[in-house]
Design a protein with these regions (language model features):
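Membrane-water interface segments that mark the loop-to-transmembrane alpha-helix transition
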Residues: 1-33
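Juxtamembrane helix-boundary/capping and inter-helix hinge elements in multi-pass membrane proteins
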Residues: 2-10, 68, 163-169
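Membrane-interface junctions at transmembrane-helix termini in multi-pass inner-membrane proteins
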Residues: 4, 54-74
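Juxtamembrane "helix-exit" motif on the non-cytosolic side of transmembrane helices
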Residues: 29-37, 85-92
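Hydrophobic alpha-helical transmembrane segments
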Residues: 75-119
Length: 170
């Protein structure tokens, strides 16, 4: 951000809004066509969880760039502690309760991360889309990010789609 600390939080907010719209749209399409046999509550919780986890991904990248590794670890410890606690508390509501506990815990994790970013980079402005300007777009970072994430997820896809290691749960 070229030493302009005041532009970090508005850019983060803009990116988060953009990401929520994109992941929300993708989630609605998937929810509509692929989980029709599940309850409406289950589908809404899956949508909320997908959007919140996508937000967490962005917040983690921001905090990593700020070299706030201990804060990231503490945020995840609190968030996942809440996830387990809420899931245990809501388990009488079956799958929807467990999923609701997961989403609540992830939301707490996200809020904690956003507070850390806000505390480190306060701003007078709420939102900006400077990251979308052509001069701020770097294709090399797009490809590095794509292949890094592809590598992280490749083994998961292999396990999910290789029949001997996967089985339908729902």
């Amino acid at each position: 951000f070229g030493g302009k600390d005041e532009s970090i939080m508005p850019a983060f907010d803009g990116l988060l809004l953009y990401q929520m719209l994109v992941s929300g749209a993708i989630g609605i399409v998937v929810m509509t066509f692929f989980f029709t046999e599940q309850s409406v509550m289950y589908r809404l919780l899956m949508l909320a969880g997908f959007v919140v986890m996508s937000d967490i991904w962005i917040a983690t990248i921001f905090l990593s760039g700020m070299k706030q590794y201990k804060a990231i670890l503490n945020s995840f410890a609190v968030g996942y502690g809440c996830t387990v606690g809420f899931a245990l508390l809501l388990r009488p509501f079956n799958l929807e309760g467990l999923l609701g506990g997961f989403v609540l815990g992830q939301f707490i994790l996200l809020i904690g991360m956003v507070i850390l970013i806000l505390r480190n980079y306060p701003s007078r402005y709420f939102i900006a889309f400077d990251f979308a300007k052509k001069k701020m777009f770097f294709w090399s970072l797009v490809w590095v990010g794509f292949f890094y994430n592809f590598g992280l997820w490749l083994d998961k896809f292999m396990f999910w789609f290789y029949l001997p290691t996967s089985q339908p749960i729902i």
